[in-house]
A protein has these predicted regions:
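N-terminal metal-binding scaffold of metallo-dependent hydrolase/deaminase domains
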Residues: 1-27, 38
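Alpha-helical scaffold segments that flank or form the walls of functional sites
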Residues: 12, 38, 54-120, 142-154
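Histidine-centered catalytic micro-motifs
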Residues: 41-53, 187-196
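Structural preference for beta-strand elements that scaffold enzyme active sites
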Residues: 44, 101-102, 122-124, 156-162, ...
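Active-site beta-loop-alpha junctions enriched in small/polar residues
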Residues: 49, 108-109, 128-132, 164-166, ...
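Active-site gating loops and adjacent loop-to-helix segments of metal-dependent hydrolytic enzymes
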Residues: 54-86, 120, 124-127, 195-240
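Active-site gating/metal-coordination segments in enzymes
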Residues: 101, 142-187
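Active-site-adjacent C-terminal substructures of enzyme catalytic domains
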Residues: 166-172, 224-226, 230-289
Length: 289
């Protein structure tokens, strides 16, 4: 927000639109007295997983990120639809009480889109996508395209695409999703440089993430480490331009290219603190680029 704070001012609204902010105070009988309040734009929660709200207090930090993912998958798979929807609505109400009026949410199950669209946020609902087998990229994108072609489910929401992370999405799928985002003019988002294992996975391979993929029957034996940082890797796949990059805990060497490609970084301090990470979130450095 820019500009001076207006104390004891008047805000005029016509047909739902703000038409004037002034220091005068009229005597209009329809005026609302909010003299004990602060009027300001609503907050934006740029990254959330409301579909996982029902798992609150059921997960704890694990010895490794891969172990935490295993626990999340196990608990999440046992959640019934009613509990999940109840959790989504509870999380939404908590956001509203905190002043959030707009959000970017990762939606793993398209069946939940009508529920998400009914929450009355201005929102971008990112279709979270996982697929490390290169051969499956075409089929995955065909299913996503059907969703993108569907009827709008809320006038306040739009769809985006979210390849989950560099360690869970194949190069072919990344490229295909980038093209799909351009075709349908929808925003693209990805978890990037969240954990040190991710950087190791792309540089030389990481046994813990490889083992996790193999357990899920998701490993592609043809895949080879590209020898790049997460940011360099996404740039090589031509999807870095204007990307909404989530977490960005390990990007110190990539700040210039992020600025050049107009990457929007979304930092998640509560998540970072919960996992006990210490080197993270170069907010000021990135803003100064």
């Amino acid at each position: 927000m820019c500009g001076e704070t207006v104390e004891n001012g008047e805000l005029t609204v016509d047909a739902g639109n703000i038409v004037e902010i002034s220091t005068s105070q009229g005597n209009d009988a329809t005026a609302l007295d909010l003299s004990d309040c602060l009027l300001m734009p609503g907050f934006v929660n740029a990254h959330s997983h409301l579909g996982l709200t029902a798992l609150e207090k059921k997960l704890s930090p694990a010895k490794s990120f891969a172990d935490w993912i295993r626990a999340l998958i196990s608990i999440n798979s046992g959640l019934d639809d009613e509990s999940r929807v109840r959790g989504i609505r509870a999380g939404a109400e908590e956001m509203k009480r905190s002043g959030v009026t707009a959000l970017g949410d990762y939606v793993a199950e398209p069946d939940l889109l009508p529920v998400m669209g009914g929450l009355e946020f201005r929102s971008v609902l990112f279709l979270e996508t996982i697929g490390f087998h290169s051969e499956k990229a075409l089929a995955i994108c065909k299913n996503l395209e059907e969703t993108l072609k569907g009827d709008p489910f809320s006038p306040l929401s739009r769809l985006g695409l979210a390849p989950h992370a560099p360690y869970s999405v194949s190069p072919n799928l990344f490229r295909s999703l980038g093209k799909l985002a351009q075709q349908y003019d929808c925003p693209l988002s990805c978890h990037v440089a969240e954990i040190p294992e991710e950087s190791g996975f792309l540089q030389n391979g990481d046994d813990s993430l490889e083992e996790l993929l193999k357990e899920r029957s998701a490993w592609d034996p043809k895949w080879k480490p590209p020898g790049k940082s997460p940011i360099e890797y996404l740039n090589s796949l031509n999807i870095l331009e204007s990307l909404l990059a989530i977490h960005c805990n390990f990007i110190a060497a990539d700040l210039d290219v992020m600025a050049l490609k107009k990457v929007s970084a979304v930092f998640c301090p509560k998540s970072t603190h919960w996992f006990g990470r210490k080197d993270f979130m170069p907010v000021r450095t990135l803003l100064d680029r």
